[in-house]
Amino acid sequence: MSTDISLLNGLLDVTSTYSSIGQTSFKATLKTQYGSFLNPVLVEGLVAGDMALYNVTDSASVTITSIAESPDGTYQINFASQTVADVLRLTITKDGYNFAAVTANTITI
């Protein structure tokens, strides 16, 4: 068997920034390490099935009710109501990406 290693691709590391955090929603902007400060390469096209939300404080899964991407790479994530000061963890899975930094970056309600 012959393999051309020049055809192999590594995973793109992804970071997250959270904003508009509330008891039922938050926005997540997802960027790779590529591009520039003014024109970063964003992670686009994710759907609800790519994401899971977990309440670290209560040790319980949180139901995501809807996800909308607008603008590109920024996701409005709506979920079942959570208690103020609870800590949430967003986990994303998508081929070609490494979301370890996103998972480590928790969200405080």
Where would I find each of the regions flagged by the language model?
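Solvent-exposed strand-loop boundary residues in beta-sheet-rich modules
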Residues: 34, 57-59, 96-98
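Short, acidic Ser/Thr/Gly-rich low-complexity loop/linker segments typical of extracellular
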Residues: 62-72
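Short strand-edge motifs at loop-to-beta-strand transitions and within beta-strands
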Residues: 73-77
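Surface-exposed, short loops/turns at beta-strand junctions within beta-sandwich domains
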Residues: 78-87
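Short, surface-exposed alpha-helix to beta-strand junction/turn motifs within ectodomains of secreted
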Residues: 37-62
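Enriched for extracellular/lumenal, surface-exposed ectodomains of secreted and cell-surface proteins
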Residues: 90-103
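Beta-strand-rich structural segments
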Residues: 19-39
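Short S/T/G/P-enriched beta-strand
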Residues: 1-26, 100-109
